[in-house]
Amino acid sequence: MTKHIAILRGDGIGPEIVAETVRVLDKLIAQGLDVGYEYAPLGGEAYDEYGHPYPEFTQNLCRKADAVLLGAVGSPQYDNLDRPLRPERGLLAIRKDLNLFANLRPAILYPELANASTLKSEIVAGLDILIVRELTGDIYFGEPRGIRVLENGEREGYNTMKYSESEIRRIAHVAFQSAQKRSKKVCSVGKANVLETTELWREIFEEIGKEYPDVELSHMYVDNAAMQLVRAPKQFDVIATGNIFGDILSDEASMLTGSIGMLPSASLDENGKGLYEPSHGSAPDIAGQNKANPLATVLSLAMLLRYSLNDEARAQQVENAVQKVLQQGLRTGDIYEEGTKLVSCSEMGDAVLATL
């Protein structure tokens, strides 16, 4: 049965990197992949067309699709809009609407890019971490929240950090099941010494861990985890954490690899439906200049094939094509170094197609 993908170009470099990735998708379809796709706007593009960053047309298409592929959202020209209308709110809205509670962010250092990391190569060579971040709870979505005026006239900002047992259980299963396909280690990260939210988190992870006796479970405070990611990152396999801690740690881990332009991400629901996007932003400073690195988006397509279409063979085919391109010495500006060949966004896309 034909699977359907909703493709959201987004803002900034989004249309360029998505265009190169769709060329890869088209070639896979020509080779026999039974998939159809349709475009819809999200973020600033959607606001310009519909007056809302996540309009009804996009909602309906994404709800019906088996998976969603996104470029990037956000641009300075929208910074003065009311908060609910800003492009980034469209991304939050689609995660909530599709109940995408599990964010998977790999941090992989390809051997060809070992010199791109700011850390010594012996510390990061062979790095392969997966950060599993809970995406729909925690302080980003907790109520009540707001800014209020106190009796003394001073203003106070407040937010609510909270997690339910069921929210923790389902992300724990994702973390342990991911670890089973890797090196069978989960490190649960929180701040259980001062936060009741993560005290419960730790308790539930211990409970769920008993269902996965082949996976080693450890716990770490978030401040120590941030330090250990820089000191000895290869000790980690799967890091499982809440929304706000995961937001910070996944960005930190991404820079161990030298360029966030290489890193894909997946956000999944309980049935494997997912939103796939590069970890980087919309980079409006280079938008429209054919300079962007499309490889994170291409690798996001590989994750889509793996997690939503259960097509491991084609996922590996795409990942191998990316590695071959790097072995050929081709580099966009963000990963360029002396002795390699600087190429444009579309030239990188050409190279991936040629090796696919």
Curated annotation (Swiss-Prot):
Gene Ontology CC terms: cytosol
Cofactor comment: Binds 1 Mg(2+) or Mn(2+) ion per subunit.
UniProt keyword Transmembrane helix, yes or no: no
Stretches of the chain forming a coiled coil according to its record: none
Positions with a binding annotation for substrate: R95, R105, R133, D223
Site (Important for catalysis) location in chain: Y140, K191
Key word Oxidoreductase present: yes
Keyword terms: Amino-acid biosynthesis, Branched-chain amino acid biosynthesis, Cytoplasm, Leucine biosynthesis, Magnesium, Manganese, Metal-binding, NAD, Oxidoreductase
Positions contributing to NAD(+) binding: G281, S282, A283, P284, D285, I286, A287, G288, Q289, N290, K291, A292, N293
Superkingdom in the source lineage: Bacteria
Pathway(s) annotated for this protein in UniProt: Amino-acid biosynthesis; L-leucine biosynthesis; L-leucine from 3-methyl-2-oxobutanoate: step 3/4
GO BP term, example: L-leucine biosynthetic process
E.C. code: 1.1.1.85
Necessary cofactors: Mg(2+); Mn(2+)
Pfam families for this protein: Iso_dh (PF00180)
Binding positions (Mg(2+)): D223, D247, D251
Known function: Catalyzes the oxidation of 3-carboxy-2-hydroxy-4-methylpentanoate (3-isopropylmalate) to 3-carboxy-4-methyl-2-oxopentanoate. The product decarboxylates to 4-methyl-2 oxopentanoate.
Subunit structure: Homodimer.
Family: Belongs to the isocitrate and isopropylmalate dehydrogenases family. LeuB type 1 subfamily.
Name by which UniProt lists this protein: 3-isopropylmalate dehydrogenase
Organism: Neisseria meningitidis serogroup A / serotype 4A (strain DSM 15465 / Z2491)
